[in-house]
A protein has these predicted regions:
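Generic recognition of flexible, low-complexity loop/linker segments
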Residues: 3, 18-21, 86, 96-100, ...
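Conserved hydrophobic/aromatic beta-strand scaffold that supports enzyme active sites
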Residues: 5, 13, 21, 30-32, ...
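Intrinsically disordered, low-complexity coil segments
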Residues: 52-55, 86-92, 101, 140-148, ...
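Ligand-binding loop in jelly-roll beta-barrel domains
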Residues: 20-39, 148, 152-153, 160-188
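C-terminal amphipathic alpha-helical segment
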Residues: 41-123
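Glycine- and acidic-residue-biased ligand/ion/polar-headgroup-sensing regions
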Residues: 1, 27, 111-146, 152-154
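Short acidic-glycine-tyrosine-enriched beta hairpin
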Residues: 3-15, 139-163
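Loop-centered beta-sheet repeat module
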Residues: 1-47
Length: 188
């Protein structure tokens, strides 16, 4: 009656600005990109989960009620927060799309689909990436700033700002299958 359910499938992207009631459903793998996921979260319900101390985790009904944005109905959420992808660029064997985050967030996220090597640039900021499709990829530096390394599905890796250019390529194991990464950085 008071909360809507939005079925999620692989590679869906949900923007969750402050004040949005949300949870993940059973059997869902979630990649949460957030600056403060546990500092400012007011749990309205916690499904009976226990904390590290073995006690039920606290809920914050009074605080939560005060920060809910009550103007966000199901129609608004579907129009503004679900799968708001925007094509940005494409080249030989790759395409880039802006996935969010919400305009109130200071983090930018992009998804790259690729079947060929893709050149990236840190833009002077730290890049945090996750391989969200495909078994494995190779990350290397055209300038030799670091030793090449392999990332596997669902692994997160960080590229320091000082690296500049770096490349992500399908591994021999991934040949013939599209891969995808999510890249996040602090907006300037």
């Amino acid at each position: 009656r008071f909360v809507n359910r939005i079925p999620a499938k692989k590679h869906d992207h949900f923007l969750i600005p402050a004040g949005t009631v949300h949870c993940s459903g059973a059997g869902t793998m979630v990649l949460e990109i957030s600056a403060t996921p546990y500092i400012f979260t007011f749990k309205l319900w916690d499904w009976g989960r226990l904390g590290l101390d073995g006690l039920p985790r606290p809920v914050h009904l009074e605080h939560g009620e005060k920060v809910i944005d009550w103007q966000r109905d199901a129609q608004w959420v579907h129009q503004h927060l679900v799968n708001q992808f925007e094509p940005v660029a494409e080249g030989n064997g790759w395409r880039e799309e802006r996935t969010g985050l919400h305009e109130r967030e200071f983090i930018e996220t992009r998804r790259h689909w690729f079947s060929e090597p893709v050149l990236h640039h840190t833009g002077g900021g730290v890049n945090v990436l996750n391989l969200v499709e495909g078994d494995e990829a190779i990350v290397d530096s055209p300038t030799g700033a670091f030793e090449p390394f392999t990332v596997h599905y669902a692994e997160t890796f960080i590229i320091p700002a000082s690296v500049g250019d770096y490349r992500i390529s399908p591994s021999a194991r991934a040949s013939g299958h599209p891969l995808a990464t999510i890249k996040a950085w602090v907006r300037s």
